[in-house]
Regions:
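N-terminal signal peptide c-region/cleavage motif recognized by signal peptidases
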Residues: 14-16
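Conserved catalytic core of nucleotide polymerization and phosphodiester-bond processing enzymes
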Residues: 10
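Positively charged n-region of N-terminal signal peptides that target proteins for export
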Residues: 1-4
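Conserved, structured core segments of small domains
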Residues: 19-108
Length: 108
């Protein structure tokens, strides 16, 4: 349900005719990190669907928390990526903007 709410908000507030940036805030259990550790960087990057691109991924290995910054033409691509880890990770997807876009929005 949460995923569909985020998708609806994204479509309302983001210009989905061009690529947008999304922050995935995640918390993974130890099983996820066991799987993650067996993968190559190429395999990890290959998990992002065509039309989406990982900009950055950071981990707090002490808590299992982390973030992924993804650029995507379509928000459903980001949801599909996060869903691939949903058995071992909880995640929240939030559309984000850079300073320039934030200023455009805030000064309207």
């Amino acid at each position: 349900m949460k995923k569909y709410f985020v998708l609806a908000i994204t479509m309302l507030f983001c210009n989905i005719s061009q690529a947008a940036v999304y922050l995935i805030d995640f918390k993974c259990d130890q099983e996820a990190y066991k799987v993650f550790a067996t993968m190559t960087l190429e395999e990890l990057d290959g998990e992002f669907l065509e039309g989406s691109k990982k900009l950055a991924r950071y981990h707090d290995l002490t808590t299992g928390n982390g973030i992924v910054i993804v650029e995507a033409d379509d928000p459903t691509l980001v949801i599909e990526f996060a869903n691939g880890w949903s058995e071992v990770c909880e995640s929240a997807i939030v559309p984000v903007v850079d300073d320039k876009k934030a200023m455009e929005i805030l000064t309207r």
